[in-house]
């Protein structure tokens, strides 16, 4: 199992999923030297400033249309 990665939610982009059950957010990695940020889909309540524990840090979600 890969190591866990902490990421901070910087922007809530919108709702996604067939019934709007997921939220698409932009996250910035906390321990990364390059201030890398990616877009992820999050299930459950989330808002800006929340800290997420990502099991997979390389996967990025497709953008909303």
Curated annotation (Swiss-Prot):
GO cellular component, one term: ribosome
HAMAP family xref list: Ribosomal_eS28 (MF_00292)
Presence of keyword DNA damage: no
Any GO MF annotation of the entry: structural constituent of ribosome
Pfam families named in the record: Ribosomal_S28e
Classification via InterPro entries: NA-bd_OB-fold (IPR012340), Ribosomal_eS28 (IPR000289), Ribosomal_eS28_CS (IPR028626)
Family listed: Belongs to the eukaryotic ribosomal protein eS28 family.
Subcellular compartments: Cytoplasm, Cytosol; Cytoplasm; Rough endoplasmic reticulum
Protein name: Small ribosomal subunit protein eS28
GO terms, biological process: cytoplasmic translation; maturation of SSU-rRNA; ribosomal small subunit assembly
Assembly with partners or alone: Component of the 40S small ribosomal subunit.
Keyword Ribosomal protein belongs to the record: yes
Keywords: Cytoplasm, Endoplasmic reticulum, Ribonucleoprotein, Ribosomal protein
């Amino acid at each position: 199992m890969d190591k866990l990665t902490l990421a901070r939610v910087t922007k809530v982009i919108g709702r996604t999923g067939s019934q709007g059950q997921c939220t698409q957010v932009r996250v910035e990695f906390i321990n990364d030297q390059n201030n890398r940020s990616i877009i992820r889909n999050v299930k459950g309540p989330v808002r800006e400033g929340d800290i997420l524990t990502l099991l997979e840090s390389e996967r990025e979600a497709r953008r909303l249309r």
